[in-house]
Amino acid sequence: MNENIKLTEQEIIRREKLKKYEDLGVETFKKFDHEKINIYSNEINQKYSNLTKDELLEKQIKLIVAGRILTQRGPFIVIQDTNGKIQLYIDKKELEERKETLALLDIGDIIYVKGTLMKTMKGELTIKVNFFDLLTKGLTPLAEKYHGLVDVEERYRKRYLDLISNPNIKEIFWTRTKIISKIREFFDKQNFMEVETPMLHSILGGASARPFKTYHNSLSSSFNLRIATELPLKKLLVGGIDRVYEIGRIFRNEGIDTTHNPEFTSIEFYQAYSNLEIMMEQTENLIKFIAKELGLSKIKNHDVEIDLLADFKKINMVDAVSEATKVDFRNIDLNKAIEIAKSYKIKVEKYFKVGHIINELFELLIEKTLIQPTFVMGYPIEVSPLAACSKDKRFTERAELFINTKEYANMFTELNDPLDQRRRFEAQFEEKESGNEEASEIDEDFLNALEYGLPPAGGCGIGIDRLVMLLTQKESIREVILFPTLKKKQL
């Protein structure tokens, strides 16, 4: 044992019990070699809660369960399995030969139980135990019984304890699982193909973000962890897979806050022979489908109710900014735009053009007002290097979906002109040379793919973590990621 580890009194007592188990010939960390579990806690209540005490006595229902001990009170023990809690009744007279091992049980131990279902005088479903076995001895006590694990940072750092101590946490992640399942169902019904594309990219692309860098020893090559799945998915459109999607991890070497984690989960989907309007329709239908299927159509934002089944609004970015600033940003030169930006205390980078400033003003003035589901359309070309232009070439056929002031989806009519795409990449490269670390690089392989012909298409990316936040009404992305990225703990 590491002599630097200081044990608490309870931890010392539990380790002493290991020796007592050993003296009794009882293994404390077993392989599972028993008859299979035949029921879980939620099924017990669903199947048998309507039976009376006498009916249960007559039927003699035999159950096999396992779980972690949460409480011990006289002859009653409550264990927790994956779906909830089960009460056990132990008559020590009937388990005389196991009385010594029974006496060594602690809260946190994992046990295996066979028994007969009964009801107590209070009408609680309970398993009367006729066989039990210790499967795993808990050497460290669980969080304090009545308060659970309340330190927020510690909850994220020790999610395993959080799941044991706070039953509602597990519900969040069941909801997350259901949301992802419904996303797949939505696209599978439309004959989309789910694919997996590389996480190691030699060229950055598909988004504006700083990457995590790594190195492949055998290839003697530097790689980036992907910041988006867009470019490989569009190559698949070129290859004739007309409907494609990917659910996967994305990595961005950026700040951490309530809506950003360096690694997160997204879905990107692409559809040939479609456009921005179809992408907005698909996105709205997807969110409504999930909300309806999960019974989560009404979301509370403090005193405001957000109705996910109502028609989503549509606004134009430049019009919204013009209205908020009382300045016509469709007809403005760069010097005037810079002057206005500085009046709002916006830091103007040397590579900024009018489009950058429109986007900055939108983020400052408009985003915070978007509570009900709203598509914001008409993004400037400077911040949309992969989107097709609108009739006014300064803007693109791009939209983002905002709900409760946060961005949930980014979609556009895909740019399929390889010559224009090269010009956009070159403009991005100039921005990178001028200090924009998030600008895209020139991806020659992607440009080559476009030269073979990308059909007219629409594409969309949705942050799944934020969607889970919305539907579970959580304020922090850390609440919906099992193991969020945390600062190293100071010892």
Curated annotation (Swiss-Prot):
<dbReference type="GO" id="GO:0005829">
    <property type="term" value="C:cytosol"/>
</dbReference>
<comment type="subunit">
    <text>Homodimer.</text>
</comment>
<keyword id="KW-0479">Metal-binding</keyword>
<keyword id="KW-0030">Aminoacyl-tRNA synthetase</keyword>
<dbReference type="Pfam" id="PF00152">
    <property type="entry name" value="tRNA-synt_2"/>
</dbReference>
<dbReference type="InterPro" id="IPR044136">
    <property type="entry name" value="Lys-tRNA-ligase_II_N"/>
</dbReference>
<dbReference type="InterPro" id="IPR004364">
    <property type="entry name" value="Aa-tRNA-synt_II"/>
</dbReference>
<keyword id="KW-0460">Magnesium</keyword>
<keyword id="KW-0436">Ligase</keyword>
<dbReference type="GO" id="GO:0000049">
    <property type="term" value="F:tRNA binding"/>
</dbReference>
<dbReference type="GO" id="GO:0005524">
    <property type="term" value="F:ATP binding"/>
</dbReference>
<dbReference type="GO" id="GO:0006430">
    <property type="term" value="P:lysyl-tRNA aminoacylation"/>
</dbReference>
<dbReference type="InterPro" id="IPR018149">
    <property type="entry name" value="Lys-tRNA-synth_II_C"/>
</dbReference>
<comment type="similarity">
    <text>Belongs to the class-II aminoacyl-tRNA synthetase family.</text>
</comment>
<dbReference type="GO" id="GO:0004824">
    <property type="term" value="F:lysine-tRNA ligase activity"/>
</dbReference>
<dbReference type="InterPro" id="IPR045864">
    <property type="entry name" value="aa-tRNA-synth_II/BPL/LPL"/>
</dbReference>
<keyword id="KW-0963">Cytoplasm</keyword>
<keyword id="KW-0067">ATP-binding</keyword>
<dbReference type="Pfam" id="PF01336">
    <property type="entry name" value="tRNA_anti-codon"/>
</dbReference>
<dbReference type="InterPro" id="IPR002313">
    <property type="entry name" value="Lys-tRNA-ligase_II"/>
</dbReference>
<keyword id="KW-0547">Nucleotide-binding</keyword>
<dbReference type="InterPro" id="IPR004365">
    <property type="entry name" value="NA-bd_OB_tRNA"/>
</dbReference>
<dbReference type="GO" id="GO:0000287">
    <property type="term" value="F:magnesium ion binding"/>
</dbReference>
<feature type="binding site">
    <location>
        <position position="407"/>
    </location>
    <ligand>
        <name>Mg(2+) 2</name>
    </ligand>
</feature>
<feature type="binding site">
    <location>
        <position position="400"/>
    </location>
    <ligand>
        <name>Mg(2+) 1</name>
    </ligand>
</feature>
<dbReference type="InterPro" id="IPR012340">
    <property type="entry name" value="NA-bd_OB-fold"/>
</dbReference>
<keyword id="KW-0648">Protein biosynthesis</keyword>
<protein>
    <recommendedName>
        <fullName>Lysine--tRNA ligase 2</fullName>
        <ecNumber>6.1.1.6</ecNumber>
    </recommendedName>
</protein>
<dbReference type="InterPro" id="IPR006195">
    <property type="entry name" value="aa-tRNA-synth_II"/>
</dbReference>
<feature type="binding site">
    <location>
        <position position="407"/>
    </location>
    <ligand>
        <name>Mg(2+) 1</name>
    </ligand>
</feature>
